[in-house]
Amino acid sequence: MKVKARFGIIVTTLLLGTTACLNGCATMGMGKTEATKTTAKVETAETGLKQTLAQVDATQASLNSLIEPSQADVKNKFEAYSADVEKTEKMAKQLEKDQAKMQEQQREYLAEWEKKERTYTDPSLREASGQRRAALNSAYSEVPKASTQFQDALNGYLSQVKQIQTQLSLDLTNKGIESITPAAQKALSDGGRLKDTAEPVITAMERVMSEMAREGSGAAAGGQ
C-alpha cells in the first residue's frame, strides 16, 4: 500500500509539473512573439527614418542644382526636384505612420507585460519583472520626446521646399529662379540640420532595441 501511495504521489507531482511547464512555455512563447513584434516595429521606424534622411539629401542635391545661375536644362532639373519633393513628402507621411504603429505596439506590449506580472505570487520575481518593465518604459518614452523636435523640423522643411516648388511651377525663368534663391538657401540650410535633430531619435530607438535584447527577449513580458 505504501508503495502504491508513493507511486500515486510521484505521478501526481509529474502531472502537476508537466501542466506548469506547459503553461510556462505558452506564456514564454507569447512573450517572445510580442517582444519580436515590438522590436520589428522599432526597426521599421528606424529604417524609415534613415531612408527619409537619405531622400532629404536627394532633395537637397536637386534643389542646389536647380538654383545654379545661368544653367541649361532648367525644365528637367525642375521636374527632378519636384519628384524628389513629392517622394520626400510621401516618405515623411509613412514615417509618421510607422512611428505611430511602433508606439501603439509598445503600449500593448507593456500593458500585457503588466497584466502577466500581476499574476506572479513570488515577490522577488514580481520585483525583477517590474524593474525590467520600468527600464523598457523609460527607453520607450524617450522616442516620442525626441521625435517631436525632428518631426517639427521635417514638416517645416517640407513646407519650404513645397512652396519653392509651387512658385517655380508658376515662373521657371532665370528671374524666377533668382527670386526664390534666398528661400532656397534657407531650405538647404534647414535641411542640412535635419540629421542633427534625427540623431536623438535614432539613439532612443537603439536604446529600446538594446533593452529588448538585454537578457534575451524571452525574459520580457513574463517570459521567465
Q: Can you annotate each of these PLM segments?
A:
Residues 2-11:
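Bacterial N-terminal signal peptides that target proteins for export
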Residues 26-90:
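Immediate post-signal-peptide N-terminus of mature secreted/exported proteins
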Residues 19-24:
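C-terminal motif of bacterial Sec signal peptides marking the signal peptidase cleavage site
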Residues 98, 102-182, 199, 214-215:
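Extended amphipathic alpha-helical interaction segments
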Residues 42-56, 85-88, 92-106, 143, ...:
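Long amphipathic alpha-helices with heptad-repeat character
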